[in-house]
């Protein structure tokens, strides 16, 4: 019986993190234990579709776009309570969310940093002060068309998204240093 040997290649950014960035962070922060070095835990991509309260078909486009961008089926988020002013009932779909971990996370981050962010018009860099106090970073994109996987002709409407990068860093400075070494284009304040 022959077995097919499948060679799995490590994502480019993950390899760079293990070979270069861990050493740079250990040197910069004088960590004694290699497990103290901050790393990535997960990336959460959230797309809110408030208009879906009036037209339920809009959520399908958001789910399709998010699945195309991330390569993973999104979870449809539903309203937890009714709000009369927004014509919203409990249980209505109002958004889609994907949590990326492992190799998919590293590949998505690589595509985001090397392809998607440079395609944003008038991009001046990300705000480096938006960390949450625990080393996690959240930022928003105004349109899904910056990702090359999305076919420009099949976009039914522009949708923005929130991207949260969760790290094991304990302070904002450690988180910012990790993200800067990974290649996040922060503005110089």
Swiss-Prot record:
Gene Ontology molecular-function annotations: rRNA binding; structural constituent of ribosome; tRNA binding
InterPro entries: Ribosomal_uL5, Ribosomal_uL5_bac-type, Ribosomal_uL5_C, Ribosomal_uL5_dom_sf, Ribosomal_uL5_N
A Pfam match: Ribosomal_L5
GO biological process entries: translation
Record keywords, A-Z: Ribonucleoprotein, Ribosomal protein, RNA-binding, rRNA-binding, tRNA-binding
Assigned GO CC terms: ribonucleoprotein complex; ribosome
HAMAP family associated with the record: Ribosomal_uL5_B (MF_01333_B)
NCBIfam families from the UniProt entry: PRK00010.1 (NF000585)
Function: This is one of the proteins that bind and probably mediate the attachment of the 5S RNA into the large ribosomal subunit, where it forms part of the central protuberance. In the 70S ribosome it contacts protein S13 of the 30S subunit (bridge B1b), connecting the 2 subunits; this bridge is implicated in subunit movement. Contacts the P site tRNA; the 5S rRNA and some of its associated proteins might help stabilize positioning of ribosome-bound tRNAs.
Subunit-structure text: Part of the 50S ribosomal subunit; part of the 5S rRNA/L5/L18/L25 subcomplex. Contacts the 5S rRNA and the P site tRNA. Forms a bridge to the 30S subunit in the 70S ribosome.
Family label: Belongs to the universal ribosomal protein uL5 family.
Identification of the protein by name: Large ribosomal subunit protein uL5
Gene transcribed to yield this protein: rplE
